[in-house]
Design a protein with these regions (language model features):
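Juxtamembrane transmembrane-helix boundary motif
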Residues: 1-16, 34-38, 42, 63-178, ...
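Transmembrane helical segments that form the transport core of multi-pass membrane transport proteins
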Residues: 193-211, 216
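Transmembrane alpha-helices of multi-pass small-molecule transport proteins
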Residues: 48-63
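Transmembrane helix boundary and interhelical junction motifs in multipass membrane proteins
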Residues: 23-31, 183-193
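Short hydrophobic/aromatic, small-residue-rich stretches within specific transmembrane helices
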Residues: 49-53, 209-213, 234-239
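Single transmembrane alpha-helix segments in multi-pass membrane proteins
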Residues: 17-29, 198-199
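Small-residue hotspots at the loop-to-helix junctions and early N-terminal turns
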Residues: 42-47, 206-210
Length: 287
């Protein structure tokens, strides 16, 4: 391994750690394309990214827990279904051809941009209904209702589409499958699904997501390690950088407006999807 590659891996790890704390993703959305660009096989990129994510997510979640922003019961409810499906994802990753693995990863990024926008519209609709009820003098609103309001100030269950238990199982299962299949912690699907199905604010979804990623990434990495796909030295370098980056970003997240965090998350997904589609095309035409 050259000095240049070593520095690139360390810098990428720090950047992924910063994204983990700010956006609730393990960093796989950045690390997988980077490792593919460094000529690692897609299945190795997926597996090694998972190892890095374990270290990064543990670092960020410990910091969130110390600051009182992490609900362990919520993490457990979403995380345990992910343990089983992560093994399924790790198995499928070894079967798919490289170009198909990258293509479906890019489609996943696009899907998440759409899900976040859907949730944004639903939240706006619910807030408008509450505002209309206040103007009509509905009981229970009174002097304590102030605008603008947050998700947590909406009426109970008004912001939840499905039963919470079902929503947690569905969210965790999807996250685990993606963790094993694509080498992501699952945050790219957990954040929008928590917002969409559980009615969480984006900051709460991010903090819970990072905690769940600890579980999903460990499970997925174990599955890949059993198949010999993990590059341990590369993963530890990335993880060391991620540990530092996550400590910084988790301290700053509570100070940022939800609108800025949401815009940053969607912008990142859009840029990465373009790169991943290009990589998929290159793999396809080169056989």
């Amino acid at each position: 391994m050259s000095i240049t590659e070593l520095l690139m891996l360390g810098a990428a790890g720090i950047f992924a750690g910063i994204l983990a704390g700010f956006l609730g993703i393990g960093g796989g959305t950045v690390l997988v394309p980077l490792l593919v660009a460094l000529n690692y096989a897609p299945v190795q990129a997926v597996a090694t990214s998972g190892l890095s994510i374990v270290i990064t997510a543990i670092s960020g979640s410990i910091q969130n827990w110390r600051m009182g922003y992490l609900s362990l019961s919520q993490v457990a409810g979403i995380g345990f279904p992910a343990v089983l499906t992560a093994q399924i994802g790790a198995y499928l990753a070894g079967i798919f051809p490289p170009y198909l693995l990258l293509l479906t990863f890019g489609l996943l990024l696009w899907l998440n941009i759409y899900l976040i926008e859907v949730r944004k519209r639903l939240t706006a609709k619910k807030k408008a209904e509450v505002e209309q009820g206040e103007l009509g003098g509905q009981a229970g609103q009174g002097e304590n209702a102030q605008l603008p309001i947050t998700n947590h100030e909406l009426p109970n269950n008004s912001n939840i589409i499905f039963h919470p238990t079902f929503a947690k199982i569905a969210t965790g299962s999807a996250a685990g499958l993606l963790a094993g299949l694509f080498g992501v912690g699952g945050g790219v699907i957990m954040v929008p699904l928590q917002i969409l199905l559980l009615g969480e604010s984006i900051k709460t979804a991010i903090q819970t997501s990072l905690g769940v990623i600890v579980i999903t990434a460990i499970s997925a990495t174990a599955g890949h390690a059993a198949r010999g796909n993990v590059l341990w030295v590369v993963g530890l370098i990335l993880g060391g950088g991620g540990l530092l980056g996550a400590q910084v970003s988790t301290r700053f997240l509570p100070r940022l407006p939800d609108r800025i965090v949401s815009l940053a998350f969607r912008s990142l997904l859009a840029v990465l999807s373009i790169y991943v589609f290009w990589q998929a095309w290159q793999k396809f035409i080169n056989g």
